[in-house]
Amino acid sequence: MAAASNSAPLDPKLGRAADFVRPDFHQVNLDLENYLKTERNFKLDADQQICPLSITPLGCPLPPSQCPYRHTTPSQLNFKPPPPLPAHPREREKKLTVCKHYLRNLCKMGDNCEYTHDFNLRTMPVCIWFVKQGKCELGGECLYFHPRDRRVECPDYNRGFCVLGPNCPRKHIRRRLCDAYAAGFCPDGKDCKLAHPSPNRPPAESYINPIPPDPEAFNGPPPQLPAGYGRWREYKYDPNAVVVPAAAWVEGGSLSGWRAGGFLSANARRDNQRNRDNDDEGGRGSGGERKGGWQKDLSTVLCFRCNQYGHFANNCPNQYVPGDRGGGRRRE
């Protein structure tokens, strides 16, 4: 059995009973972990979970019981610089697209996922439909940034007082006064996050709100058609294009294509129309018998909702059949 080491001090009143009254396994390091990290080269901890000061020569000033991060030996795969972005625009957009399975805590790829697991809306591109129409059909599921407030900061409030008060059309952001700046000099300068009130009157340009971005200037894919779904080289955004619903496995699926169908690009629509024409010609030439393309045998398809063969889960006719709907038991 692997030994465990915990450097947390014992409670003088509880002693060893503290492990049972208030168990804390945050700083427990097993010998098996060191073996997997050093010998098998496994990455057991994320970079955000390890205390960066604990691996320095000076060490962390906080004891392990008070530090919110883990004091453990990192693996060789930890603290590696991120790989450079690919040169192809489609592959680059794929690396910048947030993994939809990661948002639902269902991604099993981990660091090997081809999509990013760093979800920060302010680093995402601006949603062109929200800028142009003032709303987005995806709402909270949209992975692009919705700039709801494009007002500038009130320069008078930053100086110390605004006569308009809450009726001011500009933003009032409360900041604490920088003690070093009030004393005469702040070494951080413009990078300081505290307030640096200026005695001079602000210029007239500081009261003007920024110009909203032009939707025509965006060359990236819209929210319903991100990179990784469809062909980037053959895709051109057209706001007047007709959206055609398609199956989830057809080229050009949207963010919700895995559950409610996707969207076909122009090439996919052209190919589908050509297939329909060929099917019609084949049906007329063979006495009315229709010759379609390859079709999956439904007798081999198992519905994960009702556990019966013969249909897909999105076309399940047994809506009221009890059982393991969606594999909930397996996830437990």
From Swiss-Prot:
Pfam families: zf-CCHC
Family annotation (PROSITE patterns): ZF_C3H1, ZF_CCHC
Predominant cellular place of this UniProt entry's protein: nucleus
Family (UniProt): Belongs to the CPSF4/YTH1 family.
Protein name per Swiss-Prot or TrEMBL: mRNA 3'-end-processing protein YTH1
Subcellular location per the Swiss-Prot or TrEMBL entry: Nucleus
InterPro entries cross-referenced by the UniProt entry: CPSF4/Yth1, Znf_CCCH, Znf_CCCH_sf, Znf_CCHC, Znf_CCHC_sf
Swiss-Prot/TrEMBL GO biological process terms: mRNA processing
Record's keyword terms, sorted: Metal-binding, mRNA processing, Nucleus, Repeat, RNA-binding, Zinc, Zinc-finger
PANTHER family xref list: CLEAVAGE AND POLYADENYLATION SPECIFICITY FACTOR SUBUNIT 4, CLEAVAGE AND POLYADENYLATION SPECIFICITY FACTOR SUBUNIT 4-RELATED
Function of the molecule: Component of the cleavage factor I (CF I) involved in pre-mRNA 3'-end processing.
Annotated spans, Disordered: 269-293
Zinc finger (CCHC-type): 301-318
Zinc finger (C3H1-type): 45-74, 93-120, 121-147, 148-175, 149-174, 177-199
GO molecular function annotation: RNA binding; zinc ion binding
GO terms for cellular component: nucleus
